[in-house]
């Protein structure tokens, strides 16, 4: 429901892997933000790295993109960033809510970070509270209760929580390092994600300075 990094890409990756595990060949469909004609977005490059063998079709027209994916053998379509894209019928709506900013400053963009009123969450079948490990358990319960109250009786049937934690470091040459390799080290951080503050907190938890 909010702009910025809510952890959608890891959730898309997980969902596609669940489709594969269940025997359905998935394809990821997205708008392709940040890429011009003939170019590949950074998100598409990341998905290609973590989901080898899974097609990623980017098009502003998600219906056309889904048709292309199906024509190439996809049995399941994972629509990235498509909760507000209602032209494409879907079987399951999963919404990611960032635990560190669940209400998008309480206002629609540009005054706040909401794409639509919070009550729109009632259309979701499942809600995943991302970065849940970044807040206290009592706060998690408060957030879920507040969101459920906004949704009313027709709200999501499944409420889940996800922790975002790195499990290895990789150098530009492809060499893998243990997480403690940055402990106590002075680090200059660069990122291209929607929530750079979350990236900074991750480095701080790893002991970088």
Predicted regions and their residues:
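Phosphate/Mg2+-binding loops and adjacent switch elements
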Residues: 24, 28-154
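A short, charged helix-loop
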Residues: 103, 166-180
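G-domain G4 guanine-recognition motif of GTPases
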Residues: 126-139, 162-169, 190-195
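Walker A (P-loop) phosphate-binding motif
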Residues: 1-35, 134
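Hydrophobic anchor at the start of a short beta-strand
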Residues: 25-26, 93, 159, 187, ...
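Redox- and metal-dependent alpha/beta enzyme cores, enriched for Fe-S-associated oxidoreductases
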Residues: 175, 182-209
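Beta-strand->loop->alpha-helix junctions that form or flank phosphate-binding loops
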Residues: 150, 155-165
């Amino acid at each position: 429901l909010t702009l910025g990094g809510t952890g959608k890409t890891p959730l898309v990756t997980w969902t596609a892997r669940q489709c594969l595990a269940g025997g359905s060949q998935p394809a990821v469909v997205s708008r392709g933000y940040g890429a011009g004609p003939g170019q590949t977005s950074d998100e598409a490059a990341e998905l290609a790295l973590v989901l080898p063998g899974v097609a990623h079709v980017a098009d502003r027209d998600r219906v056309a993109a889904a048709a292309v994916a199906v024509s190439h053998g996809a049995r399941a379509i994972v629509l990235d960033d498509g909760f507000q894209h209602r032209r494409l019928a879907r079987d399951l709506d999963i919404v990611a809510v960032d635990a560190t900013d669940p209400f998008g400053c309480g206002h629609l963009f540009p005054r706040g970070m909401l794409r639509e009123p919070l009550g729109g969450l009632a259309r979701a079948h499942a809600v995943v509270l991302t970065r849940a490990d970044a807040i206290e358990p009592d706060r998690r319960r408060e957030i879920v209760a507040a969101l459920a109250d906004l949704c009313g009786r027709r709200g999501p049937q499944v409420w889940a929580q996800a922790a975002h934690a790195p499990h290895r470091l990789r150098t530009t040459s492809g060499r893998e390092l243990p997480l403690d390799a940055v402990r106590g080290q002075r680090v200059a951080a660069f990122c291209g994600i929607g929530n750079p503050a979350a990236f900074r907190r991750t480095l701080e938890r790893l002991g970088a300075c």
